[in-house]
């Protein structure tokens, strides 16, 4: 009788294992992070295969099908997200706009991180007057009204794509310089850097093979957190007509273009606006999650 009772009590125990594993999984990977990763992967897939996924060329016009509403608003599957006043397919333009905006944001963020990290490491290595100059440049950059300067530069020199990417790359480099300088100074005071230096290793090897790999996780987290800001900056400048110029297209370009048809054809700017919001939100969620897991200063 005792064995029967013991067996009855012990029967539910196997169910606790899978439930606890699921709880641990969602604790390590929250649903919001999984959704953010899924959206980012979808955007990267679209950017890589926009030529294959787009049913039309983003410059193809059809004046007989101008301002066609999307499927949910009385349109047909010929234009899933509708068309603009020149008959261009909004869905096709959206796919190529995602590619363009992500490329600009990626190279702009990478350029800013490269400039800032290089200056930060130089300040940490040479110290003294070099550090003073770098800190002065950091304060100067942080105090500049970047948007006004960007408007002036693009209006004066024209809106070439290369100049636009370089200009975005010079935005926000000071945050990487501060991080790289502080972490490099801390790393130089630790035993492994001093030991390599005493063995006669050159400075480029010390920083390239020992210091930089140890501070890379924090820099990557900072890049992830800055990426949404770069997307919004590109979208804002393109919205004002100073970013990506026709016939090229970007998310901000589409929003600025659809502004003129907000009353008659709101779908022109609705789709790129939703993509901008969801993309920046997803990358921000992923960046916060990476910061909690990778940033050693939070442990």
Regions inferred by a protein language model and the residue ranges of each:
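A general boundary/transition motif marking the beginning of the first structured unit of a protein
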Residues: 1, 10-14, 33, 55, ...
